[in-house]
């Protein structure tokens, strides 16, 4: 699987290392940065690069990171590379500036920072960690989180506050695990990083760690939602679980040791820019038209700030600068009061730092570079008449709607005009179909899925006429068409009629064949396929495929999806709370895809599972890991370099993107600042003829808590550009 020519490179680099050690290593051992001719490849030094060797008392340090950071540019900028087998490194394509350079790696502590400019060679001294605890401070959050002791299988179903403290609504251990990974707190921020595994001083005055945790989860504007999550699990038992975890860590318990980057992982180059502001948090980023990633080449990127602020952050990666685009609702007087902090925050005190009225969740670029977003256009209760019962709107006649909390909007960079778009259906994620109408499909509609014909909307400006929605109807009578007469979700299957289900989409992903896939949260969860038909409001049919369960209702392997995507072959790829990536291929199904038995558990053979590369929770003996990625994104067009249809998980506990390459994981780890956490990525090809330099993945720091990163309060969100060069020394 490893495609680099390692034998030749090892021999060549080994000879160079020996020559350099004789003639020049002594002059540079202290970090001296005089320009030289013979760099790590024995050629003239590139005037936009910094290179050298990393050594320690143990010899060359392979698979460690060399980081260059500067604040000389319009926004904070850094670039990170990995050393090869001989400890050699090359940091390419650096803008002219003064940089701090240092070494970070597993088994090390950070080396002293050395100042340098592009065009210099710089040998660096790595610093061996003085003890195991010092080394573990740099491990990904998921390694620490794997020390969590999940309640035993025998404790389920829960017996409530007067019993074992676990909610009686949780029937098995798997559903509990879902809530401690991507179905709970991990959906908003990383767990296991230093900010979480250590209790802040604000909570030091309590008699027990359980009491301290009870106070902790009430902090800040998210205190209410955190408290509700705990109550849903059974707050007393859950608080005891987390208190035990942090107590053991405080007493010196350490996690397993991660391996250093190897193989293709050493070819990764990561460039970072700051954007937004220290009190805002990002959700997603968009760089191009998903359907043609050569569009918007070298162009600006746009982000979404969800509940934190009323603007779109903008990054210009060529000018290394950031900006803001204001967004707003249709009613300028709609300005709801931001939620007050439930209790004092250890970072922000009693200050409410989030104040968005627009709730921008997800951006997407179209074929002309417009930025389409899911955003609030009006107050949720101000429902247009055309949405409701009695309207002549075709979708309302089929299935009228009431309130919805988030809608659509579009920003045109050419005219610099933003326009809110009032929709009847709620929205969350959005993605364009490959059709002549440039149909924008959305998730987040609950009982329905909604869409906007953007061609029609741009031509007419008529939002009502350009939108539509449909409920989710299973073809349970097996006649191959949708019938007007169907049974409701709370009614039993009738083999002579179709059935409506409440399988609201979380993710949404139009496929090349015109179908629209999505993920359904909960336990065991499902992927859902919608076939729109000629008139989706009345013709769309749904297929529903649950994660497989055994006769006891326990998972056969993985469970509980969150984000998902589709590849060019119509295979769905999904991130699971169980710590897996899974694929679902409906062409493998042996049973009928419609009829009275096609209600969820009818195609276990369509599923394949890939355990994410983190340790499993300490006391769990079932398949999975302590990961639980937020989203799966498929690189359909080889924007990164691992090939078409490469599925990539967001790796929220790994501090990395996790690319599945020929059945093996490639970890695109972000070592600095610790705490990388993203909810989405995008891939763009800026120049198809430029090799690795003309393509790459884009992501943003998406946690609600940028102040949890190692750089602490004052840290803003970041944009990350991941690129993969042919070898670690390519400039």
Model-derived regions: residue spans:
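The canonical Cys-X-X-Cys-His
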Residues: 181-193, 242
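Short, acidic Ser/Thr/Gly-rich low-complexity loop/linker segments typical of extracellular
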Residues: 71-93, 114
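A short, solvent-exposed loop/turn motif at the edges and junctions
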Residues: 71-76, 98-119
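Short Pro-Gly-centered beta-turn/loop motif in secreted/extracellular proteins
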Residues: 61, 90-98, 106
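Short, ordered, surface-exposed loop/turn motifs in non-cytosolic proteins
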Residues: 48-50, 56-72, 76, 96, ...
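Short, conserved, GDST-rich strand-edge loop motifs in beta-rich repeat architectures
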Residues: 195-202, 296, 303-306, 373-404, ...
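Structural signature of eukaryotic scaffold interfaces centered on beta-propeller domains
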Residues: 276-297, 352-368, 429-437, 495-513, ...
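Beta-strand-rich domain onsets/edges
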Residues: 24-49, 53-59
């Amino acid at each position: 699987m490893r495609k680099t020519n390692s034998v030749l490179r090892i021999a060549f680099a080994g000879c160079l290392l020996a020559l350099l050690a004789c003639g020049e290593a002594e002059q540079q051992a202290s970090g001296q940065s005089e320009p030289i001719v013979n760099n790590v490849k024995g050629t003239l030094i590139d005037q936009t690069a910094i290179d050298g060797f990393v050594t320690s008392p143990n010899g060359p340090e392979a698979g460690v990171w060399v980081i260059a950071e500067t604040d000389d540019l319009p926004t904070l900028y850094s670039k990170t590379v990995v050393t090869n087998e001989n400890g050699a490194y090359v940091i390419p394509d650096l803008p002219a500036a003064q940089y701090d350079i240092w070494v970070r790696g597993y088994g090390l502590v950070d080396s002293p920072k050395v100042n340098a400019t592009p065009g210099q060679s710089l040998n660096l001294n790595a610093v061996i960690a003085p003890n195991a605890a010092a080394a573990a401070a740099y491990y990904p959050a998921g390694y620490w989180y794997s020390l969590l002791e999940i309640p035993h299988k025998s404790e389920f179903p829960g017996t409530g506050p007067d019993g074992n403290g676990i909610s009686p609504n949780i029937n098995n251990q798997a559903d509990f695990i879902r809530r401690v990974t991507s179905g709970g707190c991990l959906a908003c921020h990383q767990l296991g990083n230093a900010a979480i595994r250590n209790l802040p001083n604000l909570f030091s005055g309590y008699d027990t760690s359980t009491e301290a945790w009870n106070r902790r989860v009430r902090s800040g504007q998210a205190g209410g939602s955190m408290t509700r999550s705990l109550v849903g699990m059974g707050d007393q038992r859950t608080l005891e679980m987390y208190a035990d975890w942090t107590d053991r860590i405080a007493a010196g318990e350490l996690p397993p040791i991660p391996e250093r980057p190897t193989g293709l992982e050493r070819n990764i180059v990561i460039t970072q820019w700051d954007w937004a502001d220290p009190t805002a948090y990002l959700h997603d980023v968009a760089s191009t038209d998903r359907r043609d990633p050569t569009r918007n080449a070298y162009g600006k990127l746009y982000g979404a700030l969800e509940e934190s602020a009323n603007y779109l952050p903008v990054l210009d990666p060529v000018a290394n600068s950031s900006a803001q685009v204001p967004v707003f609702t249709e009613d300028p007087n709609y300005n709801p009061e931001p939620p007050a902090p439930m209790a004092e925050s250890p970072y922000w005190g009693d200050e409410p730092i989030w104040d968005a009225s627009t709730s921008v969740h997800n951006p997407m670029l179209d074929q002309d570079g417009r930025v389409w977003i899911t955003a609030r256009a009006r107050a949720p209760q101000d429902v247009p008449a055309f949405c409701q019962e009695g309207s002549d709107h075709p979708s309302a006649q089929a299935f009228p709607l009431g309130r919805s909390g988030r809608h659509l909007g579009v920003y045109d960079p050419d005219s610099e005009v933003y326009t809110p778009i009032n929709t009847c259906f709620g929205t969350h994620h959005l993605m364009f179909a490959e059709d002549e109408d440039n149909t924008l499909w959305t998730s987040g509609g609950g009982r329905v899925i909604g869409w906007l014909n953007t061609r029609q909307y741009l031509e007419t400006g008529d939002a009502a006429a350009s939108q539509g929605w449909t409920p989710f109807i299973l073809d349970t009578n097996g006649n191959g068409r949708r019938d007007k007469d169907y049974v409701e979700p709370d009614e039993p299957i009738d083999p002579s009629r179709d059935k409506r289900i409440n399988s609201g989409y979380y993710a949404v992903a139009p496929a090349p064949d015109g179908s629209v896939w999505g993920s359904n949260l909960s336990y065991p969860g499902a992927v859902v396929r919608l076939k729109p038909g000629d008139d989706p409001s009345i013709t769309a049919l749904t297929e529903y495929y649950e994660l497989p369960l055994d006769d006891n209702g326990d998972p056969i392997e993985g469970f509980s999806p969150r984000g998902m995507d589709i590849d060019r072959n119509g295979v769905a790829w999904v991130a699971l709370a169980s710590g897996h990536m899974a694929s679902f291929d409906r062409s493998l199904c042996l049973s009928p895809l419609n009829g009275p038995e096609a209600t969820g558990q009818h195609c276990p053979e369509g599923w394949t599972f890939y355990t994410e590369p983190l340790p499993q929770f300490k006391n769990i003996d079932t398949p999975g890991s302590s990961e639980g990625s937020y989203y799966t994104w498929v690189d359909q067009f080889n924007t990164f370099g691992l090939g078409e249809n490469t599925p990539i998980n967001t790796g929220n506990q790994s501090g990395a993107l996790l690319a599945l390459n020929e059945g093996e994981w490639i970890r695109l780890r972000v070592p600095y600042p610790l705490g990388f956490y993203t909810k989405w990525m995008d891939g763009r090809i800026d120049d198809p003829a430029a090799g690795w330099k003309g393509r790459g993945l884009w992501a943003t720091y998406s946690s609600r808590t940028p102040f949890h990163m190692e750089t602490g309060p004052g840290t803003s969100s970041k944009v990350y550009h991941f690129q993969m060069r042919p070898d670690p020394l390519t400039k």
